[in-house]
């Protein structure tokens, strides 16, 4: 079941298992923000997102939130929530992010159970180009519990794909 709830930004917790850049499960929001700002993987691109968002927060794409006990974890929409937390000073940043849009302190969120959230995330990101082939396989195996693909096995055993990003393509996976 899904429902829309208005939640306070200060209560929202960033998802450590985000396929964009998974981090230690005990990491804090600040740890995730610091990593996103470093953006060594070039997957977060927060300044670009801030520019694309325009002058205000667009409510047409709601963050997907799953409650773990009383903790609302942001499963989808972490980049937008990071920008919101920066905008309101809920995390510390050592650099200026230009073009931060206006974001209210309370926002509507799609609150659902983990299974629905994961299905929605896979539908939204799995084949849209926002994830690499390796990201998708990692998500399917580590988050959704599917068997490890041969492509992911090859990466885990050799590191070949991450060392050669030109191999991180669907057609390469299909050939393997």
Where are the predicted features?
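Amphipathic, charge-rich alpha-helical segments that serve as recognition/docking helices
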Residues: 16-37, 99-175
């Amino acid at each position: 079941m899904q429902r829309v709830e208005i939640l306070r930004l200060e209560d929202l917790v960033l998802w450590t298992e985000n396929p964009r850049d998974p981090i230690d499960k005990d990491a804090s929001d600040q740890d995730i923000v610091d990593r996103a700002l470093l953006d060594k993987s070039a997957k977060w691109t927060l300044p670009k997102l801030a520019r694309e968002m325009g002058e205000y927060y667009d409510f047409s794409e709601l963050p997907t939130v799953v409650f773990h006990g009383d903790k609302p974890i942001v499963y989808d929409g972490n980049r937008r929530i990071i920008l919101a937390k920066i905008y309101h000073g809920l995390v510390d940043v050592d650099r200026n992010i230009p073009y931060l849009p206006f974001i209210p302190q309370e926002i509507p969120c799609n609150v659902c159970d983990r299974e629905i959230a994961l299905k929605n995330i896979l539908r939204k990101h799995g084949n849209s180009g926002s994830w690499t082939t390796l990201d998708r396989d990692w998500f399917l195996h580590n988050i959704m519990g599917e068997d490890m693909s041969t492509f992911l096995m090859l990466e885990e055993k050799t590191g070949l794909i991450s060392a050669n990003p030109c191999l991180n393509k669907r057609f390469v996976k299909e050939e393997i």
